[in-house]
């Protein structure tokens, strides 16, 4: 599972996810990718990212390369069940990545278009966000 090795602070505030992604909205490594087109931002947990990675790499059968372009660096806390409010913030439950609309989440290279499309479709099924398959501008079929 992905998570930071060390952080400056153990817990962070929830924050708001307004607007579209300011960075990471163009392909940088591979020829194909999946982009978030959800109406508003979402948290993707490290488990969801890992499930999508496994689904894509299994279909590609170790051919080509897969890049994960998001990293779960936000700790999400939760208080235990049946505990009254107050008494401080809960313990860190899991790590999540903030994904805004327009963000490229996974990139694939070194495989044909049909293989990349199916691998990323299988990966997208594991994610709770609406996605769109994108192709690099300099790609020639």
Curated annotation (Swiss-Prot):
Family matches, as HAMAP family: Ribosomal_uL16
Composition-biased stretches (Basic residues): 1-17
Residue ranges of the region described as Disordered: 1-29
UniProt similarity note: Belongs to the universal ribosomal protein uL16 family.
Gene3D superfamilies recorded: Ribosomal protein L10e/L16
Classification lineage: Bacteria, Pseudomonadati, Bacteroidota, Flavobacteriia, Flavobacteriales
Protein name per the record: Large ribosomal subunit protein uL16
This protein's record includes keyword Manganese: no
Listed GO biological process terms: translation
Function: Binds 23S rRNA and is also seen to make contacts with the A and possibly P site tRNAs.
Molecular-function GO term, any one: rRNA binding
Gene that produces this protein: rplP
Keywords in alphabetical order: Ribonucleoprotein, Ribosomal protein, RNA-binding, rRNA-binding, tRNA-binding
């Amino acid at each position: 599972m992905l998570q930071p090795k060390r952080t400056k602070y153990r817990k962070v505030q929830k924050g708001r996810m307004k607007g579209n992604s300011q960075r990471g909205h163009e392909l940088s490594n591979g020829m194909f990718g999946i982009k978030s087109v959800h109406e508003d931002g979402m948290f993707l947990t490290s488990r969801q990212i890992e499930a999508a990675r496994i689904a894509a790499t299994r279909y590609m059968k170790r051919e080509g390369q897969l890049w994960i372009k998001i990293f779960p660096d936000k700790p999400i806390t939760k208080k235990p069940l049946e505990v009254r409010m107050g008494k401080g913030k809960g313990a860190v439950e899991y790590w999540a990545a903030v994904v805004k609309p327009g963000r490229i989440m996974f990139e694939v290279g070194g495989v044909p278009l049909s293989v990349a499309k199916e691998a990323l479709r299988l990966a997208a099924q594991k994610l709770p966000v609406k996605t769109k398959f994108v192709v690099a501008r300099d790609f020639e079929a």
